[in-house]
Amino acid sequence: MISTDPWAGAVQDIIAAGRRMDRFGWVPATAGNISRRLPDGRIAITRSGGHKGHLTADGVIEVTADGRAVRAGDRPSAETLLHCHVYEASPDVGAVLHGHSVASTVLSMMEQGDAILLSGYEVLKVFEGQQTHDTTVRLPVFDNDQDIARLSGVVAPYLGRMPAGYVIRGHGVYVWGGTMDVALARLEGLEFLLACELERRKVAR
């Protein structure tokens, strides 16, 4: 049953997204984060350390717009700030997803430049503003950094120019959308494209 309570609805969305991402192998072990913006501007986000394929309501916590836990004792993921910056940059964004797939991890390690270029694929049209396969979408690659505040500062200036999201080298992707369904569709599209690109590079070797 779909809940009319904003918090309960957000929790349901996050749990369902975690199960879907786990089915595809995008959130191994306790990797990944899932969040949804609440009507009051706060954020529902997965608790640090939980397996996203086995989430319960207790695995979702509430944080402020700048990433501080609302309830004493709750421990947000260290990467919560990266979600917060996406919401801050884009008022229309309602959900943010972070996954650790094999394709995104390997391709970002192979890529020597600052972006993975995706060209000629029909599925590029899953991204906002893309009307044709005959185009190139740039997926920015940022070097990994355990200092999340510093990494957030590097990523933030580019957030308005990322139709496909971005990838952290050797780490994983960040994708978002106006709703959880849109964010999941974009993540699925991006992961398909990255898997195709990885296969192409294997064949070309």
From Swiss-Prot:
GO terms for cellular component: cytosol. It catalyses: 5-(methylsulfanyl)-D-ribulose 1-phosphate = 5-methylsulfanyl-2,3-dioxopentyl phosphate + H2O. Pathway: Amino-acid biosynthesis; L-methionine biosynthesis via salvage pathway; L-methionine from S-methyl-5-thio-alpha-D-ribose 1-phosphate: step 2/6. Its cofactor is Zn(2+). Binds 1 zinc ion per subunit. GO terms for molecular function: aldehyde-lyase activity; methylthioribulose 1-phosphate dehydratase activity; zinc ion binding. Gene3D superfamilies: Class II aldolase/adducin N-terminal domain (3.40.225.10). Keywords: Amino-acid biosynthesis, Lyase, Metal-binding, Methionine biosynthesis, Zinc. Pfam families: Aldolase_II. Catalyzes the dehydration of methylthioribulose-1-phosphate (MTRu-1-P) into 2,3-diketo-5-methylthiopentyl-1-phosphate (DK-MTP-1-P). This is Methylthioribulose-1-phosphate dehydratase. The lineage of its organism: Bacteria, Pseudomonadati, Pseudomonadota, Alphaproteobacteria, Acetobacterales.
